[in-house]
From Swiss-Prot:
This is Aspartyl/glutamyl-tRNA(Asn/Gln) amidotransferase subunit C. It comes from Herminiimonas arsenicoxydans. Pfam families: GatC. It is an enzyme of class 6 (ligase). It catalyses: L-glutamyl-tRNA(Gln) + L-glutamine + ATP + H2O = L-glutaminyl-tRNA(Gln) + L-glutamate + ADP + phosphate + H(+); L-aspartyl-tRNA(Asn) + L-glutamine + ATP + H2O = L-asparaginyl-tRNA(Asn) + L-glutamate + ADP + phosphate + 2 H(+). Allows the formation of correctly charged Asn-tRNA(Asn) or Gln-tRNA(Gln) through the transamidation of misacylated Asp-tRNA(Asn) or Glu-tRNA(Gln) in organisms which lack either or both of asparaginyl-tRNA or glutaminyl-tRNA synthetases. The reaction takes place in the presence of glutamine and ATP through an activated phospho-Asp-tRNA(Asn) or phospho-Glu-tRNA(Gln). It comes from the Bacteria. Its EC number is 6.3.5.-. Heterotrimer of A, B and C subunits. InterPro entries: Asp/Glu-ADT_sf_sub_c, GatC. PANTHER family: GLUTAMYL-TRNA(GLN) AMIDOTRANSFERASE SUBUNIT C, MITOCHONDRIAL. GO terms for biological process: glutaminyl-tRNAGln biosynthesis via transamidation; regulation of translational fidelity; translation. HAMAP family: GatC.
Amino acid sequence: MSLALSDVKRLSMLAQIDLTDAQSAQTLDKLNGIFALVEQLSAVDTTGVEPLNHPIAALLPDLSLRLRDDVVSEPNRRDDYQQVAPATQDGLYLVPKVIE
């Protein structure tokens, strides 16, 4: 898959980003490079390859990863924070509607 310059200009218009012609061309080259890399990765046969939880484990299988336990380190201060909030309901913060 590759993009054309018209695609980049349309995307920049949708994202409301002003790009010069030079910037559009540079962005086109970068995006097409990314798509080429994704196509290369998609072409690799990964049948039978086990997913890794950490990439270094594949290189150094004897290394024990020093991952800390997932423990709470901060006290629950929701009530304190909600006392100074303008509006709350059932433990949630109420905010003005921003999208119609």
